[in-house]
Amino acid sequence: MGERFIKMHGLGNDFVVLDHLESPRELSPQEARFWADRRRGVGCDQVVQLLPGVEGGDAQMRIYNPDGSRAEMCGNAMRCVGLYLHEQRGMAAALAVETLAGIMRPQVTSALAITVDMGRPQWAGRAIPLDQDGEMIDAPLEVGGQSYRMTALSMGNPHGVVRVADAEGFELAKVGPLVEHHALFPNRINFEVVQVLSRSRIRMRVWERGAGITPACGTGACAAAVACMRQGWVERDCTVVLDGGELQIVWLESDRVMMSGPATEVFRGELVGLPAGF
């Protein structure tokens, strides 16, 4: 018997989902890299492992980047997991899913409308974390001989948001890895460039930590929207336009951030066998 998997995506941000709810086991960084490899494995932006909840949640979600490192949270993956647990596992439409960033609560209305309470943004430098105290709001960051004005925050994982005049023309493949590995960010960082289109609409592109450029990032969309909202550039209910589609982000007066968007199951399969050593 091989290893069964489900291929899903949220706005083109694709995942290999491993359902280990009934047979929990550890997933090594080497195995995660294999699953994510688009030539030798199945291929994905991130590997998502589902395990039994240990803190009262319906399930536990572990996220692995293509380089084998762990990610604290992924909004697009959370929508996919919510849809899978509800439609295929028969769980309630309102779920509690444990992550390294805490318990997240997806609410499934349909495959086109999954809303996730993403929690509260964290602005303190040590909470993101940054290698400095205090907040980083529209502050200069020197990268590759250029200066960018960055707002840093955590949405359960670290994000750096820079406003640009032209998101499409920004050299994200060049600047992204330099920002990710900047000395200011001890745990590395996800990097978003954002162009304000109107008071209710922004264009965002993302360089994900450990994954590179991806079509969409749920936590990144939340971070970009909230960074713009805090500085008064947009309203507190905003559409984020990503390479893969659109997400709706609302920053409530309670300080909680709500993300709404679709999730899609693409196919299911069975890996005949892992290479020796896994």
Swiss-Prot record:
Site label Could be important to modulate the pK values of the two catalytic cysteine residues, positions: 159, 208
Residues noted as binding substrate in the record, renumbered to the chain: 13, 46, 65, 75-76, 157, 190, 208-209, 218-219
Catalytic activity: (2S,6S)-2,6-diaminopimelate = meso-2,6-diaminopimelate
Pathway noted in the entry: Amino-acid biosynthesis; L-lysine biosynthesis via DAP pathway; DL-2,6-diaminopimelate from LL-2,6-diaminopimelate: step 1/1
Entry keyword Acetylation: no
EC code(s) of this entry: 5.1.1.7
Coarse class of the protein's main subcellular location: cytoplasm
Class in the EC hierarchy, top level: isomerase
Alphabetical list of SUPFAM superfamilies matching this protein: Diaminopimelate epimerase-like
GO molecular function annotation: diaminopimelate epimerase activity
Keyword annotations from UniProtKB, A to Z: Amino-acid biosynthesis, Cytoplasm, Isomerase, Lysine biosynthesis
Active site per database record: 74 (proton donor), 217 (proton acceptor)
Subcellular location: Cytoplasm
Keyword Cytoplasm annotated: yes
GO cellular component: cytosol
InterPro entries cross-referenced by the UniProt entry: DAP_epimerase_AS, DAP_epimerase_DapF
Ranges that cross the membrane: none
Taxonomy, superkingdom: Bacteria
Biological process according to GO: lysine biosynthetic process via diaminopimelate
Subunit record text: Homodimer.
NCBIfam families associated with the record: DapF
HAMAP family membership: DAP_epimerase (MF_00197)
Biological role stated in the UniProt entry: Catalyzes the stereoinversion of LL-2,6-diaminopimelate (L,L-DAP) to meso-diaminopimelate (meso-DAP), a precursor of L-lysine and an essential component of the bacterial peptidoglycan.
Family membership: Belongs to the diaminopimelate epimerase family.
Protein name: Diaminopimelate epimerase
Species assigned in the record: Magnetococcus marinus (strain ATCC BAA-1437 / JCM 17883 / MC-1)
